[in-house]
């Protein structure tokens, strides 16, 4: 079993929609970026393949790509998480699944499988966090967006750099990963304020030098 707080140190999230490249197949580009990120030291990867320019309407191709990403993560002993798609996560033996407040409940996910899935839950308010804190099924909390972000078509209001500090002062003890518009210059402040780590998408997927981007975020 993975150490959850260590796992959250640098949490990379991506799908084909995040890896544009006019000269290559997006799936191959994702695999290339993921391997470079793994080599550079990311501590977790979440496969989040949805919306425009993704393989969402090609489930067989999406599943095949998810398996390739899982296998890469296994080579580097890095947890492989699937966003939202609980059935896929269970079918391909992912290490975990991440869901939002309006997705399948962590309680139901635990009832679906005997596998020790890591379960992450997205949060935007203190009320969300308190519900997560009290659910034994939730292993870690995603908290954000810290800043406005273009990676999601619809997102909650930004919470800022200091919100995680308020959460810790209010008594939230579960592992927290901060997400949403996070850049290298924000990492130290977020961790000082109580985040266990940061989650990023384009800070890595669109970086001109993936290895350097990862090292700056660690």
UniProtKB/Swiss-Prot annotation:
Binds 1 Mg(2+) ion per subunit. GO terms for molecular function: magnesium ion binding; thiamine-phosphate diphosphorylase activity. 2-[(2R,5Z)-2-carboxy-4-methylthiazol-5(2H)-ylidene]ethyl phosphate binds at residues 149-151, 181, 201-202. One of its GO terms (cellular component) is cytoplasm. InterPro entries: Aldolase_TIM, ThiamineP_synth_sf, ThiamineP_synth_TenI, TMP_synthase. Pathway: Cofactor biosynthesis; thiamine diphosphate biosynthesis; thiamine phosphate from 4-amino-2-methyl-5-diphosphomethylpyrimidine and 4-methyl-5-(2-phosphoethyl)-thiazole: step 1/1. HAMAP family: TMP_synthase. This is Thiamine-phosphate synthase. It comes from Actinobacillus pleuropneumoniae serotype 7 (strain AP76).
């Amino acid at each position: 079993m993975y150490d959850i707080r260590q796992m959250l140190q640098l949490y990379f999230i991506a799908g084909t929609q995040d890896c544009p490249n006019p000269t290559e197949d997006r799936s191959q580009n994702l695999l290339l970026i993921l391997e470079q990120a793994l080599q550079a030291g990311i501590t977790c990867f979440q496969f989040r393949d949805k919306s425009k320019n993704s393989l969402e309407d090609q489930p067989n191709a999406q599943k095949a790509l998810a398996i390739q990403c899982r296998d890469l993560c296994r080579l580097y002993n890095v947890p492989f998480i699937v966003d939202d798609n609980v059935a896929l996560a269970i079918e391909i033996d992912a290490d975990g699944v991440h869901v939002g407040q309006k997705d399948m409940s962590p309680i139901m996910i635990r009832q679906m499988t005997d596998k020790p899935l890591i379960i992450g839950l997205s949060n935007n308010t203190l009320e969300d966090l308190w519900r997560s804190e009290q659910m034994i099924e939730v292993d870690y909390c995603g908290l954000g967006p810290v800043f406005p972000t273009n990676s999601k078509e619809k997102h909650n209001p930004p919470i800022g750099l200091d919100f995680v500090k308020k959460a810790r002062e209010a008594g939230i003890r579960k592992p927290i990963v901060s997400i949403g518009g996070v850049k290298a210059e924000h990492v130290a402040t977020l961790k000082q304020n109580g985040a266990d780590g940061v989650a990023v998408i384009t800070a890595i997927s669109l970086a001109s030098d993936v290895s350097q981007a990862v090292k700056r975020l660690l």
